[in-house]
Amino acid sequence: MISTNDFRTGLTIEVDGDVYTVVEFMHVKPGKGSAFVRTKLKNRRTGAVIERTFRAGEKVNRAHVERREMQYLYNDGDNYYFMDTETFEQLSLRKEQLEDAIKYLKDNMNIFVLTYNGETIGIELPNSVELKVVETEPGIKGDTATGGTKNAVLETGAVIQVPLFIETGDVVRIDTRTGEYIERA
């Protein structure tokens, strides 16, 4: 059991028999009445995001999620294949199970596969990945009226905002949690 006062982003909890990850939370102390915690929870099985309010100090069950280190091998369109780094067993996951993680998957990348009661509920990427820029517009000197960023297409097909000095062929470090540029690698 965990108190709602100890909620943090990324925490996995059990609510009404389903597994949820805390996406966003806010402690609210109204002038009148008791304090409460307003949360956005993502269902790990369906991917649906719900809003739920808990009383401050309310106890909820923490979901015991197992993490297995695996290596991404390849995909065949709808299925993505991973290999356990210890037992060399292969696991296939559907595109829908991976969601936004697809944008940052590179061949031979080590990730964690999350399982709950023997059921695979998703993957966990490293906090940052290094990807090559395959296409971007040339940055024009003095062109900073728009905040100094431009679109760049990465080797995985993801499109992100990068500073004007980044050119095609550069390798950049990306934060996988936010999808934002961190630095040139």
From Swiss-Prot:
The keyword Nucleus does not apply. GO terms for cellular component: cytoplasm. Pathway: Protein biosynthesis; polypeptide chain elongation. Keywords: Cytoplasm, Elongation factor, Protein biosynthesis. Its main location: cytoplasm. One of its GO terms (biological process) is peptide biosynthetic process. Gene3D superfamilies: 2.30.30.30, Nucleic acid-binding proteins. GO terms for molecular function: translation elongation factor activity. Belongs to the elongation factor P family. NCBIfam families: efp (TIGR00038), PRK00529.1 (NF001810). Involved in peptide bond synthesis. Stimulates efficient translation and peptide-bond synthesis on native or reconstituted 70S ribosomes in vitro. Probably functions indirectly by altering the affinity of the ribosome for aminoacyl-tRNA, thus increasing their reactivity as acceptors for peptidyl transferase. This is Elongation factor P. It comes from Moorella thermoacetica (strain ATCC 39073 / JCM 9320).
